[in-house]
A protein has these predicted regions:
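A structured beta-alpha segment of the ubiquitous adenosine-cofactor-binding alpha/beta core
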Residues: 1-11
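Predominantly a Rossmann-like dinucleotide-binding segment in NAD(P)-dependent oxidoreductases
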Residues: 59-62, 69-183
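Flexible, active-site-proximal loop/turn residues at the rims of small-molecule/cofactor binding pockets
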Residues: 10, 19, 99, 164, ...
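Short, Asp-centered acidic motifs that coordinate Mg2+ and/or phosphate
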Residues: 11-12, 92
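NAD(P)-dinucleotide binding in Rossmann-like oxidoreductases
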Residues: 180-189, 193-212
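Beta-strand-loop-alpha-helix segment that lines the small-molecule cofactor/substrate pocket
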Residues: 12, 18-19, 23-71, 85
Length: 212
């Protein structure tokens, strides 16, 4: 990607790699004078977030988060209705990323011979090592637009709770033949947020259990 970012005939770099490469590719692209459009998540921690913000301001290059769920037909239609006052004053909203990845976990298991986390595919590894809603913007993005977040309102309070990892641990055990003692991401995570104007948002994350 470095050779591509250095080319003089390219204005924008569209980044749709694995999560771990979103930040370094975006950083290198802006350092070489390119606008960036990044699939979510655009960064993996707060330091990376601020680095992208500061670099975008310093280089005067756009750094755009491509949260596709903000721009599908259904979401754009709902946003237009909200802005036209069809729903009145929205005081509570829900969003979620509920996507059972049971059919995909085999592809996310890099080394089926053992349970060495260093040999895992990046997505399985991230779910095993990190707790909380690790993919919030599919649900939060459209909701934030409808509630005018950072356009007159802002989130002030957040609390999150998760279930134990039941399916995750069982899946690793069945795949590796060994007990899985550490799987930090719960099967289901629920997050409640309150805004400065008293609105409430509920966000859910679940990639482990089937839903009706």
């Amino acid at each position: 990607y470095e050779a591509l970012c250095k080319r003089s005939d390219i204005d924008l770099v569209y980044i749709a790699a694995d999560w771990n490469h979103h930040f370094p590719v975006a950083k290198f692209a802006m350092e070489n004078g390119k606008h960036t459009a990044i699939e979510v998540p655009s960064a993996m921690n707060l330091d990376q977030c601020w680095s992208l913000i500061n670099l975008s301001e310093q280089t005067r290059k756009h750094c755009f988060i491509l949260e596709n769920c903000c721009y599908d037909y259904y979401e754009m239609n709902a946003l237009a209705m909200a802005q036209d006052g069809v729903f009145g004053d929205i005081i509570r909203a829900e969003g979620a990323y509920i996507h059972c990845l049971e059919d995909f976990w085999d592809a996310y298991w890099k080394d089926p011979a053992d349970n060495d986390k260093d040999n895992l595919h990046w997505r399985m590894k991230y779910n095993m090592e990190n707790r909380g809603d690790v993919y919030p913007t599919h649900g939060l993005g459209p909701v934030a637009q409808c509630l005018n977040i950072h356009r007159g309102d802002r989130f002030t309070t957040l609390v999150a709770m998760d279930t134990e990892s039941f399916v995750g641990k069982d899946w690793v055990k069945n795949k590796s033949g060994k007990e899985c003692k550490e799987f930090r991401n719960g099967d289901h995570t629920t997050t409640l947020m309150r805004t400065a104007k008293g609105k409430v948002v509920e966000i859910q994350h679940n990639v482990m259990t089937p839903q009706p």
